Regions:
Chain A
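Conserved ABC ATPase "signature" region
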Residues: 18, 136-168, 216-219
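The feature captures the beta-strand-to-loop junction immediately N-terminal to the Walker
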Residues: 60-62
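Helix-to-loop junction immediately C-terminal to a conserved catalytic motif
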Residues: 75
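Conserved catalytic motifs of ABC-family nucleotide-binding domains
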Residues: 193
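Catalytic Walker B motif of ABC-type/P-loop ATPase nucleotide-binding domains
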Residues: 197-201
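A short, surface-exposed alpha-helical micro-motif characterized by mixed small hydrophobic
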Residues: 238-240
């Protein structure tokens, strides 16, 4: 049962020390010394991080912490200045994104990239891997890809059904609402049957009702044995769905741990609110009252 | 001159040699720009390569063992076309879309100026001579001076050229249709919409963009080959950037990313251009219009066609065959 595997992975995390760079019992993705700087600005400086297989890991941090840059580097959309990282034991340092996707590591984007002038079904079919008909020569001989296409279509319909998009299959993806596009992007990523799904801010711009269904979908993905990593700002969602939380600030990983513990961590609170957030701005404490400025 | 003559002229031009050349180039552009979203502003470079390959190989290098006949020359022309696509594509297709646009528009001019200033390649005089002997030798039409189809009248050579032109177009349309309904075509359309999304789904976009550039370039080169064979003359100043912009006009007029879009566009574009010209000449001839000289008609027809296109863009921005629903979508 894949569900059991997920449960095991999650319970295994309970034994992991809540420290930055902690070793996981069954790491799927391991990154070492990843460094990315833009001129003098160090955007990412991650010494060591491991992502537990079969679990949902959240990557959080204040704006400008380098989460998305780290994400882009790992998924091949940006090049690191230094560092190595591996996926399922294979080194994938600076590997092109399309090769990563073929290895079973697929990502979504913060700004949804639904292919507007393609139908929802075509979006889904584009996700399927290893298609014979995507070779230029084979494409003019339909008998080489018709059977495969039919299978992919059936698989796409099942996924669309699950994501409540089946009725929209023949509509242009551009006619979907923002939330539906998020769903489509997630469903399309699953067409690749990935081992690891990386979601970049899956909740950005999604209404609360749809958020709940997105959360359920993310849990379902894990139950099927797929590992999930996501970047998110929404703390409720992080608390709700993630098994493990990694906190970044100023390019570094400053904390790791179970969601509740991490949110009580003083380093995390300091990173989000500033170390002196609960102190008065002035020594006397009354200069902020009305009238002093006039 | 009467209205019948005006219409006959317009129809014969709309299906004639020039329209076929533009149509072939535009069909290539449809694959590159319409389906894949590649901004090739130098389609004329591919056309020029085709024309000049035939001109140089058949006339300048006449009797050379390297080019025994027209068919081999056509093969070389197509190979040169692939080479040109690689030269243009390798450095630019990994970069943002605008770089290809800059490189292609420059390449078109570079190629024209190199041909114009190199005497071995014809120089400013261009190349004139017999370029399609083998082609005209296999003309299966019976030996007679004129062939009449209703009001249209063709010489024996013209009817052969036009027939072959449209047969080639029909075959290439069939090829385009087969390619674009396949998963390969779906990847191209995906690249047009958002390249990064396609890359994130495990497809090499660089390879597909290169294939589209090469294929579209070959279509343009076939137009160039056809040009040299049909007109038996290659002039450097025919290969100006405006050619590519007329192709874009035809493509957008007919409807981009539609298999038949370029055909509809080319027919209407050439029909209108010639109809307006001949109609104005008719009106000047019979004294209805007195404020124009016949020599002013040439530029004025472009003004009128331009106005017509503006109206089309306002009232039917998706082109004749386009789908308005599709255009209304936020493309990014």
């Amino acid at each position: 049962m894949p569900g059991d595997i997920a449960a095991q992975a999650v319970s295994a995390l309970a034994t992991v020390a809540p420290e930055p760079g902690a070793a996981k019992p069954e790491p799927l993705l391991i990154a070492d010394g990843v460094n990315r700087h833009f001129g003098g600005l160090v955007a990412v400086d991650v010494t060591h991080v491991e992502i537990q297989k079969g679990a949902i890991t959240a990557l959080i941090g204040p704006n400008g912490a380098g989460k998305s840059t780290f994400f882009n580097v790992l998924s091949g959309f940006d090049k690191a200045d230094a560092g190595t990282w591996s996926f399922a034991g294979v080194t994938i340092t600076n590997t092109a994104p399309h090769r990563l996707a073929r290895k079973g590591m697929v990502r979504t984007f913060q700004l949804t990239k639904s292919l507007s002038r393609l139908t929802v079904m075509d979006n889904m079919l584009l996700g399927a891997g290893g298609q014979t008909g995507e070779s230029m020569v084979a494409s003019v001989f339909p008998f080489t890809w018709k059977a495969q296409e039919k299978k992919n279509r059936e698989r796409a319909l099942v996924l669309l059904e699950r994501f409540n998009l089946a009725a929209k299959a023949q509509d242009f993806a551009g006619s979907l609402s923002g939330g539906q596009r998020k769903l489509l992007e997630m469903a399309r990523a699953l067409m690749l049957e990935p081992e690891l799904v990386m979601l970049d801010e899956p909740m950005a711009g999604v209404n609360p009702a749809l958020k709940q269904s997105l959360l359920d979908h993310i849990r379902d993905i894990r139950e099927e044995g797929t590992t999930v990593v996501f970047v998110e700002h929404d703390m409720d969602m992080v608390r709700d769905v993630s098994d493990w939380v990694i906190v970044m600030a100023q390019g570094k990983i400053i904390a790791e741990g179970q969601p509740d513990a991490v949110m009580r961590d003083q380093r995390v609170i300091d990173a989000y609110l500033g170390a002196h957030h609960d102190q008065q701005l002035t020594a006397s404490g009354d200069s902020l009252t009305e009238g002093t400025s006039s | 001159m009467d209205m019948g003559f005006v219409l006959t002229q317009a129809i014969s031009q709309a299906i004639g040699v020039t329209a076929i050349i533009y149509l072939l180039a535009t069909m290539g552009l449809n694959i590159q720009f319409g389906y894949t979203g590649l901004l090739n502003f130098g389609q004329i470079a591919f056309v020029a390569i085709g024309s000049y390959a035939i001109g140089v190989f058949m006339v300048q290098w006449q009797g050379s063992a390297f080019v025994p006949n027209l068919w081999v020359a056509i093969l070389y022309a197509l190979l040169l076309s692939v080479l040109l696509a690689l030269i243009l594509g390798v450095p630019t297709l990994r970069l943002r879309a605008d770089y290809l646009a800059i490189v292609t528009i420059a390449a078109g001019e570079i190629i024209r100026l190199v041909f114009k200033s190199t005497d071995a390649l014809g120089g400013a005089q261009g190349i004139n001579g017999k370029m399609g002997e083998e082609f005209y030798a296999i003309n299966p039409f019976p030996q007679q001076d004129r062939f009449d189809f209703g009001p249209l009248s063709y010489t024996r050579n013209d009817v052969w050229v036009v027939t072959v032109g449209w047969v080639v177009i029909a075959l290439l349309l069939l090829l385009t249709w087969a390619l674009m309904r396949s998963p390969w075509g779906r990847v191209l359309k995906g690249i047009r919409e958002d390249e990064d999304a396609v890359r994130s789904l495990g497809k090499s976009t660089y390879l597909r963009k290169m294939q589209a550039l090469i294929l579209g370039g070959i279509f343009g080169t076939l137009g160039g080959i056809f040009w040299a064979v049909a007109k038996q003359s290659v002039q450097p100043d025919s290969f100006v950037p405006a050619f590519t912009f007329f192709c874009y006009t035809i493509l957008i007029l007919g409807g981009a990313a539609r298999v038949l879009g370029p055909v509809v566009g080319a027919l209407i574009f050439w029909f209108l251009l010639v109809f307006i010209e001949q109609f104005l000449l008719l009106l000047i001839d019979n004294g209805t219009i007195t404020f124009l000289e016949p020599t002013q008609v040439g530029p004025i027809r472009f003004i009128l066609v331009g106005i017509g296109l503006m109206l089309l863009m306002i009232f039917r921005p998706q082109g004749i065959l386009g789908d308005k629903k599709e255009l209304a979508l936020d493309a990014r």
